[in-house]
């Protein structure tokens, strides 16, 4: 995206990069990433989604059901970055019917994570991939894998901020501290500007006493130092249906 001043000078406007992160699986990272991105696109923003999970959960939920058959994925682009090969504008980008773009992922990314361990500048390979795209989008959302490995560190190193979807369950609350320690370490050693957007409580069930207790525990334990969004994502059987349909909640159930 470009901003033109009165004198004719052009200033490149860089995208805001948000890593959707939690080392626990099944907390709604991919669903959050997809629907947040499409929601922003509906408001006129240009959005790129990046699947950084070798399982390809985001890629599959957006309608590409066989990610292992895709010729160009995030793994392809990161391999180019590691070997100092140029990445062409728009290379590997897929276009979704609901107005967002996607850099997909597949199982090849698992092998690349192992290769990153021995790579120079290993924490910043994803940042190199995204450097060109930052001028083309308003937002870049990174769907992170359920671990705190090198790919997640790459996402945090490239991001301006991180959004943490989190189930209202005891084990999720226990695992949050480990994630926050990783964020602090990345902030100290690699990306001092990294911020925490907040915790988004997902799969909530306000009908149960247990769900309410965990909700209160998270808000009381972390609410003073981290934003815990008032808006929560309730548990719904529709979530699986929406992912299978390859659509967002906006297209699947436009009447809400």
Question: Could you say what each language-model-derived stretch is?
Answer:
Residues 1-256:
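P-loop NTP-binding core
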């Amino acid at each position: 995206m470009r901003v033109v001043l009165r004198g004719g000078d052009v200033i490149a406007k860089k995208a805001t990069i948000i890593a959707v992160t939690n080392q626990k699986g099944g907390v709604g990272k991919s669903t959050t990433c997809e629907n947040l991105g499409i929601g922003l696109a509906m408001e006129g923003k240009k959005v790129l989604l990046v699947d950084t999970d070798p399982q390809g959960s985001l890629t599959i939920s957006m309608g590409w059901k066989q990610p292992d058959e895709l010729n160009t994925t995030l793994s392809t682009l990161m391999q180019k970055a590691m070997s100092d090969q140029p990445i062409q504008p728009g290379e590997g980008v897929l276009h979704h019917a609901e107005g967002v773009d996607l850099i997909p992922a597949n199982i090849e990314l698992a092998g690349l994570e192992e290769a990153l361990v021995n790579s120079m500048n290993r924490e910043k390979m994803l940042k190199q991939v995204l450097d060109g795209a930052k001028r083309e989008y308003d937002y870049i959302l990174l769907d992170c894998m359920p671990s705190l490995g090198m790919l997640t560190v790459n996402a945090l190193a490239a991001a301006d901020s991180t959004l943490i979807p989190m189930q209202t369950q005891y084990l999720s609350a226990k695992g949050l501290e480990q994630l926050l320690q990783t964020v602090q370490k990345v902030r100290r050693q690699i990306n001092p500007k990294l911020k925490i957007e907040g915790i988004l409580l997902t799969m909530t069930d306000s009908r149960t006493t247990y769900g309410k207790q965990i909700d209160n525990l998270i808000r009381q334990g972390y609410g003073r130092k981290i934003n815990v969004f008032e808006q929560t994502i309730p548990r719904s059987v529709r979530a699986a249906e929406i992912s299978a349909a390859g659509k967002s909640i906006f297209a699947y159930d436009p009447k809400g």
